[in-house]
């Protein structure tokens, strides 16, 4: 075996994709010292997406001062690549859940304003191409905060300017984009998301994700009503119907809320990464792909990171073995086309024990070593 590609997603809550790949690489080097190993950090639009891109593209990291979800000053960073032409921005760095203590989370009051400030900073530096990863947000403002930071105004029925927070979506009566940053006209945005939820409704942004952002049942209904109302206002002003667009409900409606006002497109995060980093070219000459994530289950089959990796492996006729901290729906995963689906736990443990970073890395190393030892016996 001459070439193995390591394309691991993060084991969420335990170990990031980079450290997982390092543990796997160590095991392979010990068993197959002459094997070429290519580490390929992976994410699906959620946490780690921009980190994976910045790492692989050797991005220049820049910092700027913006506002957090409650409009408090915060310092953030993002990546610049392609000789300053492209900015890679993680939405969560300015308005992510980890920025707010769990007992203070309230998507009625939070805003994406800081993300718009990051974009404005990148525009000043000359960037005109953007990749924005929109997973892990603490917001449900449909992106009006970001747009306000870029010059848009959202007015109520009395022409009063609204604060760009979730509870005010229901009050939006007019949208004024006459002062939108002129550099946006020559800019393009790729919005990388990891979900396909519509803008509103039972499967929409508020009902599915607002509870984990701190909303109670009444607030969920209010937020959903706000999204319904705002979608109608957008349709009246732009003639674009975002109501049932797949992915429009990502990041509290930001997925759909940006499309009518920016030169933007929604893409699966894994597709963005695989295309941007030319994963297919890397895989074409490989003998094996090792991949994995914290939990392998039915979600794995639904357009997430490993699904994208598997599709490339099948196209290039390269076997794909998936490792998971926990494995459910093994038969469904096998039917997807994985060569093998393996749990890394050597014996029953509590979830808390299983999530310990060192334990996870040891288990990855041990499992990869066993996989490689089996392969060695059949490739002599």
Feature map (PLM): residue ranges:
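N-terminal loops that bind phosphate or other acidic moieties
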Residues: 2-134, 138-380
């Amino acid at each position: 075996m001459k070439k193995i590609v390591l394309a691991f997603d993060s084991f969420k809550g335990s170990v990031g994709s980079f450290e997982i790949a390092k543990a796997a690489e160590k095991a392979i080097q010990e068993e197959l010292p002459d094997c070429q190993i290519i580490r390929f950090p992976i994410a699906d639009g959620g946490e780690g997406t921009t980190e994976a891109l910045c790492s692989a593209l050797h991005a220049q990291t820049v910092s700027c001062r913006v506002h957090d979800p409650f409009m408090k000053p915060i310092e953030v960073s993002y990546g610049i690549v392609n000789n300053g032409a492209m900015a890679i921005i993680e939405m969560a760095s300015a308005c992510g859940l980890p920025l707010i203590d769990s007992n203070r989370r309230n998507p009625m009051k939070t805003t994406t304003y800081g993300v718009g400030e990051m974009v404005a900073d990148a525009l000043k530096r000359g960037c005109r191409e953007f990749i924005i990863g929109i997973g892990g947000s603490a917001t449900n403002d449909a992106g009006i905060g970001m747009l306000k930071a870029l010059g848009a105004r959202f007015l109520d029925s009395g022409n009063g300017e609204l604060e760009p927070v979730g509870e005010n979506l229901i009050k939006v009566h007019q949208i004024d984009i006459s002062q939108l940053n002129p550099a946006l006209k020559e800019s393009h945005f790729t919005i990388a998301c990891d979900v396909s939820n519509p803008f509103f409704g039972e499967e929409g942004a508020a009902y599915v994700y607002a509870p984990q952002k701190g909303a109670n049942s009444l607030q969920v209904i209010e937020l959903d009503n706000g999204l319904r109302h705002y979608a109608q206002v957008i349709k009246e002003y732009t003639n674009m119907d975002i109501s049932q667009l797949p992915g429009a409900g990502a990041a509290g409606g930001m997925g759909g809320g940006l499309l009518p006002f920016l030169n933007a497109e929604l893409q699966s995060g894994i597709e963005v990464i695989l295309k941007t980093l030319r994963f297919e070219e890397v895989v074409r000459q490989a003998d094996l792909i090792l991949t994995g994530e914290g939990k392998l289950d039915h979600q794995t089959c639904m357009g997430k990171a490993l699904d994208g990796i598997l599709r490339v492996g099948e196209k290039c006729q390269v076997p794909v073995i998936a490792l998971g901290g926990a494995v459910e729906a093994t038969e469904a995963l096998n039917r997807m086309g994985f060569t093998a689906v393996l749990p890394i736990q050597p014996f029953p443990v509590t979830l808390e024990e299983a999530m310990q970073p060192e334990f996870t890395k040891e288990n990855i190393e041990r499992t990869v070593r066993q996989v490689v030892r089996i392969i060695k016996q059949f490739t002599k």
